[in-house]
Amino acid sequence: VGWAVVCVAGMFALAACGQQDGLAGTYRSVEELPEELGRDGTTVTVGDPRALVTVHLYEDLRCPVCEEFEISGAGPDLREATLEGTAKTQYTLASFLDDRVGGSGSKKAVNALRAALEEGKFAEYHEVLYANQPEEVVDGYTDAFLLELAGQVEGLRGPEFDDAVRTMKYRGFVTASQKAYEMAGGPAEPEGPGTPTAVVNGTPIPAEYNGILMDGAAFTELLESVGRATLWEADRT
């Protein structure tokens, strides 16, 4: 994969100009990470906003390849980079698999994650959901299961969160997030770019290089290369 990392990093270097050059902070645990909803109303950002590298992920909570990325692929390495302050992670949460395989689990999971964001627990809950992902064809993200999993995140369960899960309080967010996912595909992919898709500093990782998402060492090398290129551009300007 090494040569592919070099090729991909070169593309990202061209888009590096204009990124922030402040020194980002480090965090001891996921619980400490800043998280916020963007002005577009759909993008959730986790990590120090001053981080030189931004990784924007497009995911569907029922997607087994997303689970592979998050659990055994490069997801843990991205999490470590976010904790170190060298990268921040953004999420656009799709729910198209409900229509494709039936059920409402994706929508319910996205709604529950939005409720967790209100409690400052998005990143922690996101980890728990993927660690306990049901089979794709099983509509397993029920209200009861989502609440049970929320019990694994200290301080998340409470009347407001529980009610938001049971009533689909953030249905509008779920719909808007799916539309944002579809728009990200552009004219070539009007139904969305596929999940998982990673966009690094505004440049999508090409589909032919998606193997990087399952190779933690290669993904870390990519992030470091992009970070160096971004810092170099910042020093020039």
Functional labels for PLM-detected ranges:
Residues 68-71, 82-83, 114-121, 127-135, ...:
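Sec-exported extracytoplasmic/periplasmic mature domains
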Residues 1-101, 225-237:
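Extracytoplasmic thiol/disulfide redox context detector
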Residues 146-148:
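Flexible, glycine-rich surface segments
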Residues 67-144:
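Structural alpha/beta surface segment adjacent to cysteine/selenocysteine redox centers
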Residues 58-60, 92-95, 127-130, 166, ...:
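Active-site-proximal beta-strand/loop segments in catalytic clefts of secreted hydrolases
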Residues 52, 109, 192-195:
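A structure-centric signal for secondary-structure junctions around beta-strands
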